[in-house]
Amino acid sequence: MANSPQAKKRARQNERRAEVNKARRSRIRTFLRKVEEAIASGDSSAAADALRSAQPELMRGVTKGILHKNTASRKMSRLSKRVKALSA
């Protein structure tokens, strides 16, 4: 248990940070799920739109420290490859 005032404050801040990060991670997953659903339905225009809206969310996750840069790039690359194959 945190004993010093500084440690107590850090514990409070960590709890708040964890809540914010949890919400951001959930938001990113929601956008990715929308792309997956559009791909599964076979609608190439909806999939492309969903991918366009998911990209800034992924990159925002990188800048906020939720995702590693390479992880976000890998996810974008794999999704865009699938969307491109859908329209071809």
Curated annotation (Swiss-Prot):
Coiled coil: none annotated. GO terms for molecular function: small ribosomal subunit rRNA binding; structural constituent of ribosome. Residues 12-22 have a biased composition (Basic and acidic residues). Residues 1-25 are annotated as: Disordered. One of its GO terms (cellular component) is small ribosomal subunit. Keywords: Ribonucleoprotein, Ribosomal protein, RNA-binding, rRNA-binding. Signal peptide: none annotated. InterPro entries: Ribosomal_bS20, Ribosomal_bS20_sf. One of its GO terms (biological process) is translation. Binds directly to 16S ribosomal RNA. Belongs to the bacterial ribosomal protein bS20 family. HAMAP family: Ribosomal_bS20. This is Small ribosomal subunit protein bS20. It comes from Dinoroseobacter shibae (strain DSM 16493 / NCIMB 14021 / DFL 12). The gene is rpsT.
